[in-house]
Each structure stands twice: as C-alpha cells, then as structure tokens.
Amino acid sequence: MEDKIKHKLRIGWSYLLFLKQRVIHDRLTVSAGYMAYITLLSLVPLITVLLSVLSQFPVFSGAGDTVQAFVIQNFVPAASDAVEASLKEFISNTGKMTAVGSGFLFVASVMLISSIDRSLNYIWRVKKKRRPMYSFSLYWMILTLGPLLVGASLAATSYVTSLKIMDDEIVSSFYRTLLGWLPIILSFSAFVGLYLLVPNKKVRVTHALIGAMSAGCLFEFSKVGFAQYITQFPSYQVIYGALAAVPILFVWVYLCWIIVLIGAEITASLGEFEGWLAGKVSTNILESDIKALTEQQGLIESDSTDPESK
C-alpha cells in the first residue's frame, strides 16, 4: 500500500515537472499577452456583432443589455462600473458606422476566434490545419448560433421566473441558489467546450473535464484576488484617473488568457502519457513551428547567445 502511494506521488511529481517544462517551452505568458492584445482590439466588435444578432429577433428584445450587464458583473471583478461605462460608450459609437465599417467589425471578431483557434492548436501540437471553408463555417456558426443560445437561455430564465411555482419559498430559494452558481457553471462549460471542440485533434472528455475544472477554479480564485487587489491597492485609479479602466481591463484580460492557456496545457499534457511519465517535453513539435512562433511574437534570440555559434 505504501509503495503504491509513493509510486503515485512520483508519477504526480513527474507530471508537474513535465507540465512546468511544457509551459516554459510554449512561452505561455507571451502567448497570453498576444491574445490579450488581440482580445482588446476585437472585444468591442465581438460584443457589437453578438448584440446585433440578438437585436434581429423580437423575442430577444432587451436581451442585449441584460447579457452585457451579466457578463461584466460576473466575469470582470471590481472596477465593473468604469469598465461597463467605457464599453457602453464604445459600443454606442459603433452604431454610427457605415456598412463598410460594420464589415470590418465582423472581420475583427473573426480575428479573435481565429487567434484562439491557432493558439490552442499550437498547444496540442496540431500540424494539420482545418480547411479554410470549414474554419469559416465554424467561426460563422459561433458568431450566429452563440448569441441565439444566450438569448434562448435568457428567455427561458425569464419564463421560469414568471411561473406561479416560483412563489413557493423553498423553490424560490433553490432557484436563487442555482442562479448564484450560474456564472461558475457557464465558465466551466465554456472551458470544456473550448478544450474539446477547438483543437483539430481528438481530446478525451475526462482530460477536458480536468483541464476545465483546473481553469475554472483558477478563474474563480483570480476574480476574488483581483477584486481585492483593485479595492485594497487602488494605484491604477491614482495614476490613471478617469483612464484607469483601460489598464485594469488589459491586466484582467491578460490574467484570463493565462488561465485559459494553463487549462489547455493541462488538458493536452494529460494526453501525452509517454512524455510526462518520462518527464520530458514532447518532441512532436517541429523546429520550424517553434521558429515561426518566436518570429510572430518578436522573441527570436540573437545568434550570439547560442553556445554552439561561439
């Protein structure tokens, strides 16, 4: 019994070492910074596209404001008033754009989804890319069906709330508790879907669940910690004043992408049994892929730092 425990502890330790090497190898913090930059460029266009899709259906009238408020209040800790005011101002300005400008908004939204696709497939060492038509169909489905599913869930929530059975105190208390857990359930479901569907590779459901659970826990802890930091150490407000919402939003988006990519690394590494049992980084990735990634992020080391070149 004791030997089995020691064996499992050794396997667990070797896995943690492998995961650490994998994270360093994949330049996770650099990738998170790149994704945060793309997200900030595409965030307002993406929200605008989602709200415009919802506005096309009378049954979802008013759902856009509800979705926007729910996301900001539950997924952007602290500083939500400043961030919400800035986002609403940006989104209201997009209503003055022409058809050509609206087309660019759609392109910017696709850029974000495409960047997510590339980053996660890199973590999974996927060499075979999806066909362009398939990728476009996938992105189009996300931008159209996504808002409809959100609107449908809001309509269902409103319908359930209006039922007479909700007058019962016990049922009403249970329903409020369920709504309180809704942000956690949504974030966990989003992580599972992300790790299962985005990689162009078969991913085991158990691995995706473990990665999503890890990312979900980190996300909830980071929300509490980030909110405490913002409220207890308001240095951003002192330095930036009215513009404090911009760096606060950037830091939070960067932290979110670190969490998303860590969950992806955990999910992908669990599928590499031979690699992490040996305690080595997977060698499936090509050197050309490494060079392409470093060139993209501007982090190529000079030849003078290469010991073999001396």
UniProtKB/Swiss-Prot annotation:
List the membrane topology term(s): Multi-pass membrane protein
Mainly resides where? membrane
Location comes to: Cell inner membrane
Q: Which UniProt keywords apply?
A: Cell inner membrane, Cell membrane, Membrane, Transmembrane, Transmembrane helix
Where do the TM regions start and end?
34-54, 97-117, 136-156, 178-198, 207-227, 242-262
- Work out whether the entry's keyword set contains Cell membrane: yes
- GO CC term, one of those recorded: plasma membrane
Record-stated family: Belongs to the UPF0761 family.
| PANTHER family assigned to the protein according to its UniProt record, in alphabetical order | INNER MEMBRANE PROTEIN YHJD, UPF0761 MEMBRANE PROTEIN YIHY
Alphabetized NCBIfam families for the sequence: PRK01637.1, yihY_not_rbn
Name of the protein this chain belongs to: UPF0761 membrane protein VFMJ11_0098
